[in-house]
Amino acid sequence: MFTVLGRVMNRHCALRAHSRIRMPTPMKVSSLLPLPHNLLRTYATEKHDMDELNKSTDYMHIQNILLQKEKELSTKHTLLKEATGFYDRFKINTKWFLIRGNRPFSFDELSTLFSWLIISQIIWVILGTTTFVSLVLFTFNTVFAKEMVGKFVGNTLNKYIDSCDVEFQDALVPEWKKGCIRFRSVKVRTVTDGKSDVPSDQLQFDLKFNQVDITLSVRKWMTGHGLIDNLTVLGMHGKVVLNDVNENKLVGWFSNPEYHLGAVKVCDSCFTLRDGNQDYRISIYNMDMNRLRFEWCVSDFFNANVVTGAINHSLFTIHKRQHKLAYLQDLEKDLSPWKRITRLRLDRISVKDLGLDKSSSFNWIEEGSVEIIADLMLPNVEDESQDSDEEKNNKYMVMDLKFNFRDLKAKFPESAPTLSNGETVISFDELKPIINYINNRRVIFNSVATTETIDPDWNRITPVSIKRQKSYPDTTVIPTSVTWPDGEDEVQINKEIIKYHDQPTTNTNNLILKCRIVKNIDELQNVALFRESGVYDVLAMELYVDLMKIVEEWEFKKKNSWMRLWGTTLASQLLIFGLGAMV
């Protein structure tokens, strides 16, 4: 303490002594003049003296720094000249860069270096997880056998994935250009063990992947959303089995239902899906998704950029609906609060391939085909921390569906159609008119088609010359003032004089059903299968409502036309009898 006070007093006295002497500047070293020793100075003179003192002090400080740096450089150059090898020169340069000297490191300096090393590694792992793991795998592949590394990674994954067996046949190859880790010839299959509480019987699969590219993220792993960030699958094939062994949802099969994946891409894949007693051959040509969250599987799947594939060789597409008009910025605002409108289209597929004849809701359908077009309006579903007021107000999903059935054939079922919970959708008495309507339409259209396609023998007989005039013309002559009913062609050439009473006006036996379904988006949370949301039951009831309206309208028209025909016939007969009695 006294030492510090002594230094301060000495410096104060030195400054007072220097204030009485005019210090020379660098440019005026030779012109040094003595100052008058007057004791009374003005304020301006004292200020001028202080400026000169500051200049001289800065000059001396700069000179001291330059001398110190020159001494350090000379010491560094001297040490480098005395070094005998690369290790000595590297040691001198490293110490001079870190501590500006050649002395041994102190304990504080070593602890600081160690702390910075740990922090830098943590930052590297967090920001460049994929690169870090790629270097580790590349090092292991170089040092050890590639098969050993594949088995080691497979065994490691099997410890953390319940009821699954992962096997790598080829080596692990880091893809430096794409910034991902590439696995080749990967096999994933489910195994049954009694140690796990997961209902493994609910989902079983045996899949093979030609190539799998993944990127890792420690930040996602620290938040509990899984280590894998982006996933790309090429050449997947195998078999998947879904079993309704209990009432648990499929999302409970995953050990971490909150697993979040980033970009997911699947290309050139084909697998067989067995759902109950029905087999589906599903091909995925291209699937590009921005994200895939296990708790929002259905929502993220329908919000995919594009999904193209086939179900039992019938093409299907999922994409953003294209507008007929120009897509302006104002139109995008009109579409809010929905994220976008997704168009789902499934080309014509047999009802047997789709499994409608085996379903409990439409067990009366025997043959036919169907084409499905659906527009899905899904709201924005973000994380809870990112929810806005607009997203909270809109919590409903709207689906506009159109089913185009063609050439249906119905049968009387053994049991009444029911929903998934066992409730009856429609009774036998209400189902009879529907079956009669569908089968009558099929018979009429098949009869008309047969009549148009068959060329009878009497049409090929050469005409016989008879002088007697025919009692009826070959074609029906219609005056121009007569207008055709709605639905019939305006040009009536070579039409039959005698026709079926209920002959159809179109050439195709199509039955079009439309409906709109509104569903709360919260009901799609923690749902991995679309049928688990209850949409199928609502869809079945809406289709039956529309179908019954069509049948009632057909029965009314048929009854009305018969009554009109009967009344006209009776009136004409009475008129003829009356005229005959008068004559």
From Swiss-Prot:
One Pfam family named in its UniProt record: MDM31_MDM32
Keyword Membrane in annotation: yes
Membrane topology: Multi-pass membrane protein
GO BP, one annotated term: mitochondrion organization
Subcellular localization, as worded in the UniProt entry: Mitochondrion inner membrane
Keyword Flavoprotein tagged: no
Transit peptide stretch: 1-43
InterPro entries found in the cross-reference section: Mdm31/Mdm32 (IPR012571)
Residue intervals annotated with topology Mitochondrial matrix: 44-117
One GO cellular component, as annotated: mitochondrial inner membrane
Highest taxon, organism lineage: Eukaryota
Keywords recorded for this protein, A-Z: Membrane, Mitochondrion, Mitochondrion inner membrane, Transit peptide, Transmembrane, Transmembrane helix
Primary location group: mitochondrion
Membrane spanning residue stretches: 118-138, 563-583
Mitochondrial intermembrane side: 139-562
Family label: Belongs to the MDM31/MDM32 family.
Function noted in UniProt: Involved in the organization of the mitochondrial membranes and the global structure of the mitochondria. Also required for mitochondrial distribution and mobility as well as for the maintenance of mitochondrial DNA nucleoids structures.
Protein name (database record): Mitochondrial distribution and morphology protein 32
Gene behind this protein: MDM32
